[in-house]
């Protein structure tokens, strides 16, 4: 093995298998393009983007890591979102959550 070498399997690597997904229609009502990255908590995206935010809470774009989707002014399109994993705690972004997404219900 060469230092830094990455050895991958011969088969395709599937991402987000078994994770909850949903589709939402998003419209850019602003006058500037808006770009949203792959791991941005979609619920907290730019306010000029119109979509059902409550449905998107706890989800991010279902696209490859390090990529983004650009919404042009006046554009409307359907995007697929995937549920956040791990502890399901969100900090930063627009500061609208700053903690657990949902309290555990027993």
UniProtKB/Swiss-Prot annotation:
Sections of the chain in a coiled coil: none
Location of the protein in the cell: Cytoplasm
CDD domains: Urease_beta
Swiss-Prot/TrEMBL GO biological process terms: urea catabolic process
InterPro entries tied to this protein: Urease_beta-like (IPR002019), Urease_betasu_sf (IPR036461), Urease_subunit (IPR050069)
Superkingdom classification of source: Bacteria
Alphabetically ordered keywords of this record: Cytoplasm, Hydrolase
Cellular component annotations (GO), alphabetically ordered: urease complex
Keyword Hydrolase appears in the UniProt entry: yes
Chief site of localization: cytoplasm
Catalytic activity of the protein: urea + 2 H2O + H(+) = hydrogencarbonate + 2 NH4(+)
Pathway: Nitrogen metabolism; urea degradation; CO(2) and NH(3) from urea (urease route): step 1/1
Disulfide bonds: none
Keyword Cytoplasm attached: yes
Subunit structure: Heterotrimer of UreA (gamma), UreB (beta) and UreC (alpha) subunits. Three heterotrimers associate to form the active enzyme.
Name assigned to this protein: Urease subunit beta
Source organism: Acinetobacter baumannii (strain SDF)
Origin organism lineage: Bacteria, Pseudomonadati, Pseudomonadota, Gammaproteobacteria, Moraxellales
